[in-house]
Regions:
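Domain-level recognition of nuclease-like catalytic cores that cleave nucleotide substrates
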Residues: 497, 503-528
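Phosphate-binding site recognition
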Residues: 1-424, 439-442
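Structural motif
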Residues: 152, 470-474, 506
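Short secondary-structure junctions
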Residues: 436-444, 500-502
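Conserved catalytic cores of phosphodiester-cleaving nucleases, focusing on short active-site segments
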Residues: 432, 456-460, 469-478, 492
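Mg2+/Mn2+-dependent nuclease catalytic core
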Residues: 172-177, 478-495
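Active-site metal-binding core of divalent-cation-utilizing nuclease and nuclease-like domains
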Residues: 142-147, 440-467
Length: 528
């Protein structure tokens, strides 16, 4: 067993012994299908703490021919696969964490020299009877020619150089050239599997590593379910640890990934695994994933001087989606032509989620929303912070059926934030959602809830642990009247969809008069 060549199963055994272990061995069935084929180059990009390193440790333990890991994998899902035993412990594995080499050196050139030296040392120690060159490519060719066992190459944190040497384009190109020379069109490779946060860097319209099939946050392909926790997995943990699933969903859900295949499309609701595990073990909801980086990282990007960027962030804070074009993103952290490129980067970093069907980005959950507020509180977006801070009072005014205070609070938000200019009821909706930001502490907020004879504009349904709070139906009108909004709620029987809350249900009609530029509000309580 070497440090990098056939490193054994110690790391994977550590995962298996953990208090919480979710079986993701189905990934192995996917990698087995591409071994030794044109599709043997796989690159997975996900945010920090989404299980990328754990997956690499699992693959190393499964393929490593210098150890016997059958007893571990016999208990996992992969053991049900037809080709399970065919590939188990049959390959020479090279497992590398590129960050380790970057941190130990002062330049890209030094990093690559150290990498090659350490890998060649492992090869010579393992195959001391063979004459092995001091060039990594030739050394691996020599070993393969003698053993006829191809290599599984696992590279974790492959993109660390792009994150730490953000401005050094020459170093980035040389690094990509090295990877291409080492990996491309090599018979000694059965599988080249890389993981990182960023997709593979593009220069112009070309990629130096165009042989890789990429699986990212914007296009996860058939690997969507293997990184992060699925909703079913989280439900199981909630039962085991006696945690409220509805609250877990509000805090950590929100990454919507779609797998497209000839066998049928699958939609996954993916949860942040680091956060879910900590919440279960601590038996407490909080911000856990974000501790891996400070809010300063987010702040750098959302305060960039990009046309429309601030407006988009405000819209998303209000719960709206923003349509973007992900195609112009250069897959680095410095090349931004438009706000869409910045927002695409935030998707890959985990600060936004992308819906490939609507092509819209949104803030995924309460945990990440808090990170935006932390960043904005240290910026000059004072009007946004005031609106968020005042939303607590606005929610209380709604509960108290203080219609004048609700109208005044909404008006303040509209007057303070320049992007909230009204053209119709949709633009009024953005103002309402930002004004009632604090309501998310208690409610699941649904836009256009299907009801008796139509769709209610906004419904606030209290989560189970806040069942003492009233459910709320809000109907919006633009240049009409608030009383008419209440009448529409009753006429179209919107109340029917929330009849379980009768006796604790508020109806709110809100209108904006474009002539007087004022808001009016009417609030009624529905009695049994």
């Amino acid at each position: 067993m070497g440090s990098y060549l056939n490193p054994g199963s110690t790391a994977f055994q550590g995962s298996l012994r953990s208090q919480i272990y979710i079986d993701k061995s189905g990934l192995i069935e996917k990698t087995n299908t591409v071994l030794g084929t044109e599709q043997k180059y796989v690159c997975v990009s996900r945010p920090r703490r989404f299980g990328k390193s754990m997956a690499a440790n699992m693959l190393a333990a499964y393929y490593d021919r210098d150890c016997d890991t059958k007893e571990f994998f016999d208990k996992l899902k992969i053991s049900q696969s037809e080709e399970y035993l065919k590939h188990l412990n049959q390959y020479d594995v090279l497992k590398i964490n590129m960050q380790e080499f970057l941190s130990a050196t002062q330049s890209m050139e030094e990093m690559l020299r150290l990498l090659q030296k350490r890998l060649i040392t492992d090869l010579k120690n393992r195959y001391s009877s063979y004459e092995i060159e001091d060039n990594l490519v030739f050394a691996m060719q020599d070993v393969y020619a003698n053993t006829h066992h191809p290599f599984i190459i696992l590279i974790d944190e492959w993109d660390c150089l792009f994150r730490e040497y953000q401005q050094d384009k020459d170093a980035q190109k040389k690094y990509l050239d090295f990877l291409r020379f080492w990996l491309k069109d090599k018979d000694y490779i059965a599988l080249a599997y890389m993981t990182g946060i960023l997709p593979i860097k593009k220069y112009g319209s070309h990629s130096a590593l165009n042989m890789f099939m990429e699986y990212s946050m914007t296009d996860p392909g058939e690997l969507a379910e293997f990184f992060g926790f699925t909703e079913e997995e989280v439900k199981g943990l909630c039962e085991e640890y006696a945690m409220n699933f509805e609250e877990v969903k509000a805090w950590y859900d929100g990454y919507d990934l779609i797998s497209l295949s000839r066998f049928g499309d699958k939609r996954y609701s993916i949860y942040s695994p680091k956060s879910v595990v900590e919440a279960m073990l601590r038996h407490k909801f909080g911000t856990y994933w974000n501790r891996t980086e400070t809010y300063e990282a987010l702040k750098i990007y959302i305060q960039m001087n990009m046309d429309g960027l601030k407006d988009s962030v405000i819209q998303m804070l209000a719960g709206e989606g923003v349509r973007i074009n992900t195609g112009t993103f250069s897959n680095d952290m410095t090349t931004f032509a438009t706000k869409d490129d910045v927002l695409t980067l935030l998707v890959h970093l985990g600060y936004l989620t992308y819906n490939s069907e609507t092509e819209k980005v949104t803030i995924p959950n309460k945990e990440v929303s808090q990170e935006y507020l932390n960043a904005i509180s240290t910026m000059d977006w004072h009007e946004v912070m005031r609106s968020v801070e005042n939303s607590r009072k606005l929610v209380e005014a709604l509960w108290n059926q203080d219609a004048k205070a609700v109208a005044a609070g909404i008006e303040n938000v509209h007057d303070e934030i320049s992007i909230l200019q009204y053209h119709d009821e949709n633009s009024l909706s953005c103002t309402i959602h930002l004004a009632f930001y604090f309501a998310r502490e208690y409610y699941t907020i649904i836009r256009e809830l299907p009801t008796g004879k139509g769709f209610a504009d906004i419904c606030m349904i209290p989560r189970k642990i806040h069942a003492d709070k009233p459910a709320v139906i809000i109907e919006l009108k633009w240049d009409k009247d608030a009383e008419g909004a209440i009448a529409q709620i009753k006429e179209k029987k919107y109340v029917k969809s929330l009849e379980d809350y009768k006796g604790n249900l508020l109806l709110a009609g809100i209108n904006y008069d474009k002539k007087t530029k004022t808001h009016t509000c009417v609030i009624e309580k529905v009695e049994l």
